Amino acid sequence: MASAVKVFLLDIEGTVCPISFVKDVLFPYALEALPHTLDSQWDDPAFAQYRDAFPAEYASSKEALAAHVRDLVSRDVKAPYLKSLQGYLWKNGYDSGEIRAPLFADVAPKFAAWQAAGIAIMIYSSGSVPAQKLLFGHTNSEPADLTSAIADFFDTVNAGPKTEIASYEKIASMHPQYPKNEWLFLSDNVKEVDAALGAGFQSFVVQRPGNPELPDGVEDRHKVIRSFEEL
């Protein structure tokens, strides 16, 4: 383990679960659920907050909103209002048992070990905080609900973009009891790792099965791990 780590700050996609879960399960599920949701809940006050978060030109009609969502997903645009809507759509899938998050086998045991050692676990993902809580609340692990192990959740709304140094500085400022050099951020995204390092965090690149090959030179510049067992 890296020296003096008091906080593990974890990415989700490609770090604790396969990239394919997000791309091949979650995104298609939301797109499939969207038309019925728009037809049945367009004027529902519970849905209105998600609809009205979209730019006005897209929130004006079901057709415009649906087309905009499909466009954003196809281009993998991480717009906060899209992430919030996706979380809302995924909730039904998680609640019904249709969706379970397939965590890598080392994740849940490490969560338990880190908790027992008094090390805080926090999450930082481009997915919305509600969507993060749904994912960790409905996993294939034992126990299936790991949310109680997680001290805090961060996304692009409450922290900022994951490739910006200021976002990590903001996260650290929310937990001033932990000096920046006691944080270890783990992500499959090299640009995110660079930003965390720039903020004074420790940070490693995670290379999981199904992740794209790392660019040349990454393993020369960064510590790369392939399992949390290496920590």
From Swiss-Prot:
Q: Which reaction does it catalyse?
A: 5-methylsulfanyl-2,3-dioxopentyl phosphate + H2O = 1,2-dihydroxy-5-(methylsulfanyl)pent-1-en-3-one + phosphate
- Which cell locations does it reside in? Cytoplasm; Nucleus
Q: Can you tell me which residues the record assigns to a coiled coil? A: none
Pathway connected to this protein: Amino-acid biosynthesis; L-methionine biosynthesis via salvage pathway; L-methionine from S-methyl-5-thio-alpha-D-ribose 1-phosphate: step 3/6; Amino-acid biosynthesis; L-methionine biosynthesis via salvage pathway; L-methionine from S-methyl-5-thio-alpha-D-ribose 1-phosphate: step 4/6
| Main localization of the protein described in the UniProt heading | cytoplasm
**GO cellular component annotations, sorted alphabetically?**
cytoplasm; nucleus
Which cofactors?
Answer: Mg(2+)
* UniProt superkingdom: Eukaryota
Sequence positions that bind Mg(2+): D11, E13, D188
EC number(s) recorded for this UniProt protein: 3.1.3.77
Q: Can you quote the record's cofactor note?
A: Binds 1 Mg(2+) ion per subunit.
GO molecular-function term, one example from the UniProt record: acireductone synthase activity
Top class in the EC scheme:
hydrolase
Q: Which family is this sequence assigned to?
A: Belongs to the HAD-like hydrolase superfamily. MasA/MtnC family.
What quaternary structure, including any partners, is listed in this protein's UniProt entry? Monomer.
Name of the featured protein: Enolase-phosphatase E1
Could you tell me which species this protein originates from?
Answer: Pyricularia oryzae (strain 70-15 / ATCC MYA-4617 / FGSC 8958) (Rice blast fungus)
Its gene name is UTR4
